[in-house]
């Protein structure tokens, strides 16, 4: 599934969303099969979440917000479960924050519901905690992006 995700990323970078969607769908199919066969393997569960997020990104780029929300919600469900099972793993907390951010910003008209704003606040808080724990600048940058998106909604 990793190879299909990489091919999808190349197609997406070329704005070839149809090809990207095809590759990501193949990655999702493989990830689903493996995650079902090995439900206790967190890496396979994470791969499944990544595939849902990638398909959500393609749907959002095509302005299919309903489909994007569905994919993002599935990724969020998996990310929540993994972060709860392995709270000591920063990467899984980051995945949770990314899923919260994607669900929190997916909007056809740019307006966010109170639930989406809460998701953005949660994502920013998680990234803030990760930055404090690790000192990794990427987490500080992501926290700032989430906070800026919240501030845009308040204006």
Task: Identify the residue ranges that each predicted region occupies.
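C-terminal non-catalytic interaction modules
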Residues: 125, 129-131, 135-155
